[in-house]
Amino acid sequence: MQYVIRRSVNSIDFVGISSVKEKPLLVAIFPTISNWYLFGTAIFGAVLVSFLAQLKFYLPGNPVPVTLQGFGVLVLGGVLGWKWGLVSVLFYFISGLVGLPVFANENQGNLFINLDISEVVKGYNYVFMGVTGGYLLGFIVATVFIGFIIQSGWNRGATIWSMLLGSFLIYVPALIWL
């Protein structure tokens, strides 16, 4: 694998990897899409993952809620590719860090509800240092992995295997974190 540094006006290619052969699915469907639309789609993807995080239930004896966040993250990697999928997931994290209620727990949104810094730190520690922190780390790994695999020329029919591996990559850091 050879790493190539290149500049491009039409992409956010800071460091391109030469083995990436295909465009993301969204760019393949809409070849004339601009970066502004891709950025807007990445923001929409973060909103989608935020919405899917709110659809949750708890299994008895398990402190981690069961949500559809993982599905949303897998779709982001598959549709947006590894670069824009990563932008979307990072925007999701930054939204949670500033206090927007995007995570699947009760201690969220403290910055805009209560300006008491101790409450903000408590919410931050609960989300990122608590039992769900490993899942959040796995979201980044899975999005980049799925986007890279799909852009590396895997057949669209074999996408299910990359999604299964992506799910595995979400759960490995989560289990280690617990």
Language-model features, listed with the residues they occupy:
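Hydrophobic transmembrane alpha-helices
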Residues: 2-90, 98
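Short helix-perturbing small/polar motifs within transmembrane alpha-helices
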Residues: 4, 10-31, 37, 41-44, ...
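Alpha-helical membrane segments and adjacent membrane-interface helices in multi-pass membrane proteins
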Residues: 53-144
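Hydrophobic alpha-helical membrane segments of integral membrane proteins
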Residues: 60, 64, 161, 172-175
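Small-residue-rich segments of transmembrane alpha-helices in multi-pass membrane proteins
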Residues: 74-79, 165-174
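C-terminal TM-helix exit segments that contain a strictly Trp-centered aromatic cap at the helix terminus
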Residues: 95, 99-100, 169-178
